[in-house]
Amino acid sequence: TPIQPTPVIGMVGIINDCDKAVSSGWKKINDEIWIIGSYLSEITLGASSYLEYIHGQVTGRPPEINLENEKLCQEIIRNSINKEYIVSCHDVSDGGLSLALAECSILSGLGAQINIDDNLREDKLLFGEGGSRIIFSIDINQKEGWLKYLNEFNKKIKDNLYIYKIGSVSNNKLKIKNLKKVICDLKVSTLADKFNNGIIENFKK
């Protein structure tokens, strides 16, 4: 097997208060879902899981990492968690945005209504990968306080980070729209079945 073009770095850290740690799964219906990180124009399919598993190609240039933006992104998220504004959090990595959203739904059993308005090609929007991207959910009762906190970073965020509300937690479906067109509409139970039994089904072939 050739060496993959995407490096893998493992890191550990210290959580000062474990009671404030958040998991990846959505918490409750109507919580708002946000994304922070690289602009969509910086997202690429190069060296992505999509190219490898769907098209059988291990090729392309992986996205470049901006360490200053990564630091800022992590600072905002970690502080927002400590202040208890964020109730769930998940990185957008291999598989892109669609897989990250699916994993949050599978872990919680809750769905999501996602609305994005961008001219990016659909496969790139759903499966493109890039550094410094995190999806998270906020209790709507904490939104005002969180926006005030976020305002402290306005000058740093401008032109550096993409931060945008993309939807809300719903009942039992993951539904993704782009420019009002539905590009994904799946039951969470279907996603969970494929996720949990995919390896077994593959061996049966």
Question: What are these language model-derived features?
Answer:
Residues 1-44, 165-168:
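Glycine-rich anion-binding loops of enzyme active sites
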Residues 1-8, 59-62, 74, 79-205:
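Glycine-/charge-enriched secondary-structure boundary and capping motifs
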Residues 6, 46-64:
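Gly-rich Lys/Arg/Thr-decorated short loops/hinges at beta-loop-alpha junctions or inter-strand turns
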Residues 17-29, 48-53, 72-80, 115, ...:
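Glycine-/acidic-rich phosphate or pyrophosphate-binding loops and their flanking alpha/beta elements
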Residues 25, 66, 90:
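Glycine- and other small-residue-rich loops at beta-strand/loop junctions that grip anionic moieties
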Residues 44-45, 146:
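Short glycine-/acidic-enriched loop or helix-start segments at secondary-structure transitions
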Residues 65-72:
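C-terminal transmembrane module of polytopic alpha-helical membrane proteins
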